[in-house]
Amino acid sequence: MTATPAAPHLREDLLTPRFYTTEIEKAARTSLEDQRHTFEAMLGEMQADYNREHFDRKAPLDRLRDLSPEEKEAYESYLVRSCVSEFSGFLLFKELSRRLKQAGRPELGELFQLMARDEARHAGFLNRALVAEGIAIDLPTLSTKRPITWFPLSWVLYSVYLSEKIGYWRYILIDRHLKANPGNNVAPLFDFFEPWCQDENRHGDIFNMLIRCWPQLRRGIRGKLLSRFFLWSVFLTHSLTVCERGNFYRILGMDPALFDAEVMRQTNRTASRAFPWVFDMESSTYLSLRDRIVDTFRQLKQAKGLQKLGLKLRFAGLLLRQFSQPMRATQAGAEGVLA
């Protein structure tokens, strides 16, 4: 899979998704006994496919407003990263669906099949936007040339939950901003962010239900470490990615740092419904450390020699300080103790 000659600025590493697999046999032992009512409701909602008509295959996606070459590059890079990310999610859900059905769990398999449907729809829609830009990505090739990373089931449940919820807040905050500032809506693609975020939110709720099927994942030191590590790592990745893609958010009239901070605040608040612990962002130095981490990250990209070594040490120290910031217990954690 390659970018077309029309887009030489798109690096090949943007086009390489990560594919994750997990403990399928353990996943097949998921007990739905205590979550049966929630599971049935969510399965019914997914089967109803409320967003089926929202992603119109005939919707024009090629009416960009006048953008400078640098702005166009930022927009296209955003499309590629987002498209590949959605397709990677499709591959994970499709594989889980297939393997769970083979393991004799057809209901769970169907739920993952329906989530795979949504991810494929998103990836296809983004791919159409890329084609409108004259960029061709051979998505089917990704399924035959993908690196596979194995994660324990607990890691997949925590990380995918956060990925879906942070995706929801990213899309909904961009959607709200553009509705309040229509002059910054530079591409028709953004008109579809509201139904898009509904899919992300629904998927996150499903993974919250799956986490509750394994109450031991929210108990004691294990629950606190899982909460701390995945909130920190997902937020760190988001901050550094927004830093690298700052031009994209400025095209939309958004301050990248403020956007990043609000996404983290809202995702952290939402995670309190699923995780036993979340970061205490309001009374800690978490966000001010974020600013220093991003600044050091920028300097690292330009530094050489001994200066780079010193910056790496500073960067590592800042990461450790942020990782160690205070957390607060949640009601979800109390439920995990009682479960």
Which residues make up each language-model segment?
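Non-heme di-metal
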Residues: T2-A339
